[in-house]
A protein has these predicted regions:
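Rossmann-like dinucleotide-binding domain for NAD(H)/NADP(H)
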Residues: 222-224, 228-318
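Glycine-rich NAD(P)-binding loop of Rossmann-like domains
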Residues: 118-151
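Rossmann-like adenosine-cofactor binding region
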Residues: 171-265
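NAD(P)-binding Rossmann-fold cofactor-contacting core
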Residues: 159-177
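N-terminal glycine-/charge-rich "phosphate-binding" loop or analogous flexible N-terminal tail
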Residues: 1-45
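Oxidoreductase and adenylate-handling cofactor-binding alpha/beta cores
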Residues: 100-116, 159, 293-301, 306
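Phosphate/diphosphate ligand-binding glycine-rich loop within oxidoreductases
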Residues: 43-118
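Residues forming the Rossmann-fold NAD(P)(H) cofactor-binding site
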Residues: 97, 150-151, 213
Length: 318
């Protein structure tokens, strides 16, 4: 009986599929490409390449799933991964370029007040110049210094901020890019020194409501929060009054509930840019190509009995 690789990635090009088929042939696998709209997903794959946890729910033969996403919250609680029957890997390292550019865009849109100018343009109203802020001379803190945080910090450095601070779990300073690194349990030390807070941390038990009412209050008046990590990292109920009062501003690509419900008060909140979780995805060709390349690299590793390069520890959350 042949071994099967199931691919559930709707955004692949014919060139991507050709590469996957060639790798499968080389390693003795047959390939089945499926669309996520199918009611009955294949349950006989030894390997699954997809960001959907649906494949793992009734897959007795599954031994490894490679997710196209960097975050893995959707796989928590699935027995096949929790009991060690199957390995799980992600596509961390593929999203740095696209999300870094997205974060720079979100940051500049808020500092340059493009939300207000765009709203005025929709009303056909010609606004007078508004007071703006700059990354130049600002103290910028990155909550998360992995691929996304690191790539963004490299770009932000070019704007000549007063300081670049990093917050991560282990206190490491990648390539000594940051002026100072804080561990997660030291975050309250850096928040009062932060003019712009850029969040790209994964969603874990440790980061749930990491920015609660107490910690939001530590940020200086006029600080900007930019979040592409996970929505629940910020306590939205605590953030709302800070935005409404005009003390803080925020640009959010992720939310505690997605899609954001129509009756959520954030929709009508001032000092806020709302984006519908579009920072990542596979919409940039470079991202898609890197995701496929990383999968093929680990596909060869798996077939040769070597460790996966991007294996996930579900208990840690990344």
């Amino acid at each position: 009986m042949s071994r099967k690789l199931v691919v559930g990635v709707p955004d692949l090009t014919e060139g991507d599929k050709k590469q996957i088929i060639e790798a499968a042939d080389r390693n003795g696998f047959e390939v089945e490409f499926c669309t996520m709209q199918e009611e009955a997903l294949p349950a006989d794959g030894e390997i699954v390449f997809s960001g959907s946890p649906a494949f793992a729910k009734n897959a007795e033969k599954l031994r490894w799933q490679c997710s196209v996403s960097a975050g893995v919250n959707q796989f928590k609680g699935l027995p096949v991964f929790e009991n060690g029957t199957a390995l799980l890997s992600n596509s961390s390292g593929a999203y740095g370029v696209t999300i870094a550019e997205h974060l720079v865009m979100m940051t500049l849109e808020m500092l340059r007040r493009q939300v207000e100018f765009a709203a005025a343009a929709a009303r056909k109203e010609w606004l007078k110049p508004l007071p703006v802020k700059s990354v130049y001379g600002s103290r910028v803190t990155f909550a998360g210094t992995g691929d996304i945080g690191f790539e963004t910090a490299k770009r932000i450095r070019a704007f000549e901020p007063a300081a670049l601070y990093g917050v991560n779990r282990k206190g490491r300073n990648p390539e000594n890019l940051f002026d100072r690194i804080y561990t997660q349990d030291q975050i309250e030390e850096v928040l009062p020194q932060t003019d712009i807070l850029i969040i790209s941390m994964p969603g874990t038990e440790e980061t749930f409501h990491m920015l609660d009412e107490k910690r939001l209050a530590l940020l200086p008046d006029g600080a900007l929060i930019v979040n592409v990590g996970r929505g629940f990292i910020i306590d939205e109920a605590a953030l709302l009054p800070e935005l409404t009062a005009g003390r803080l501003a925020a640009a959010l690509d992720v939310f505690e509930t997605e899609p954001l419900p129509a009756d959520n008060p954030l929709w009508d909140c001032p000092n806020l840019l709302i984006l519908p979780h579009v920072a990542g995805n596979m919409t940039l060709p470079h991202t898609r190509e890197k995701i496929v390349a990383q999968f093929l690299e680990d596909f060869d590793n798996y077939c040769a009995g070597r460790p996966l390069l991007r294996q996930v520890d579900l208990k840690a959350g990344y």
